[in-house]
UniProtKB/Swiss-Prot annotation:
Keyword Nucleotide-binding carried by entry: yes
Name of the protein described by the UniProt record: Small ribosomal subunit biogenesis GTPase RsgA
Cofactor notes: Binds 1 zinc ion per subunit.
Cofactor(s) essential for the protein: Zn(2+)
Length: 343
């Protein structure tokens, strides 16, 4: 069933209600923090944010007698938005509750704009973005390419992961093979696995060990099933595909960090069907298409838009087959979605 479009007034009312709820939550949070800080708090120590729940986060202690234990913490009002993977300074209170007093610098961050166009961090301090897709729901090259642009922009290594490889059949194999061939030709690391049958999971584990990785992808591609296969003791909830839309249903509602016994961490993020890139520039998008790198700056005209201009190096490469039409379509679609001031 198609999603009903909201008019401007309905969107305004929704945003107003959400703003009022956020203000009430912030007031409760401020009161709770004041009460905690008015009592006995332990010394400052470092911690790792492993999950985020509204006005509270779960912090894993990294030092001292409580190292490895998890505490629910409030945030001081002057702190920036924290996400799973953030390293913080915090102080422990009573009954497993604490207060975060500072955020430590991030080595990397994966961001996307929210529904109001405000930049929202998704995960912090990750080494690898694992872009998960599957035969069902049908994979969209444009979404994969958006993740790749975000990865290149953030300086984070991407891994393309086709899950549910056991669902490949005569009907979907041609389109899937054509999709995979594009990324293999570009040199992106790509792995085919089946969390259900266990195929390829040892190779995936080897790639994840020793790294901080984040799973991203649309709902229904089996991210939670992958987590369950990699970490059987976790038992994350798995949801079916919607029988009406063929799209995935959300089972992960907040990004959560898990530890591997052999070293390394994994952040499982909620599934999304769109990934906005309104925070990047046209130049960032062009740099995110790695096959463009040797061609940029070689067009006849310095301000070439790579559309219909004569002497365009990208159009010539497209004509010669050095750039795939699917990738050019994604590039143009992403550019069309950027705000005017990104040009």
């Amino acid at each position: 069933m198609a999603k009903r479009q909201l008019n401007r007034r309905q969107n305004w009312r929704i945003e107003k209600i959400q703003g009022e709820r956020a203000a009430r939550a912030a007031k409760r949070e401020s009161s709770a923090v004041e009460a905690l800080e008015g009592g006995d708090l332990g010394p400052e120590q470092t911690g790792l944010v492993i999950a985020h729940f509204g006005v509270q986060v779960e912090v894993e202690a990294r030092e001292g007698e409580t190292a490895g234990q998890v505490f629910r913490c409030y945030l001081r009002a002057n702190l920036p938005a924290l996400v799973t993977g953030d390293q913080v300074v915090w102080r422990a209170g009573n009954q497993g509750i604490g207060v975060i007093v500072a955020q430590l610098p991030r080595s990397t961050e994966l961001c996307r704009p929210d529904s109001r166009g405000q930049l929202k961090p998704v995960a912090a301090n990750v080494d690898m973005i694992v872009i998960v897709f599957a035969p069902m729901p049908e994979p969209h090259a444009n979404l994969i390419d958006r993740y790749l642009v975000a990865a290149e922009h953030a300086g984070i290594r991407p891994l393309l992961l086709l899950n549910k490889a056991d669902l490949i059949d005569e009907q979907n194999a041609p389109a899937l093979n054509a999709l995979l061939a594009v990324y293999r030709q570009l040199g992106y690391p790509l792995l085919e696995v089946s969390a259900h049958h266990g195929d390829g999971m040892e190779q995936l584990q080897a790639l994840l060990d020793g790294r901080i990785s984040v799973f991203v992808g649309q709902s229904g591609v089996g991210k939670s099933s992958l987590v369950n296969s990699l970490l059987p003791e976790v038992e994350t909830r798995v949801g079916p595909l919607s029988e009406f839309s063929g799209q995935g249903t959300h089972t992960t509602t907040t990004a959560r960090l898990f530890h591997f016994p052999g070293g390394g961490e994994l952040i499982d993020s909620p599934g999304i069907r769109e990934f906005g890139l309104g925070h990047v520039s046209r130049a960032d998008v062009e740099a995110g298409f790695i096959e463009f790198n040797d061609l940029l700056g070689t067009c006849r005209f310095r301000d070439c838009k790579h559309d219909r201009e004569p002497g365009c190096a990208l159009l010539k490469a497209l004509e010669d087959g050095r750039i795939q039409q699917q990738r050019m379509n994604s590039y143009r679609s992403i550019l069309a979605s950027l705000p005017d001031n990104s040009y």
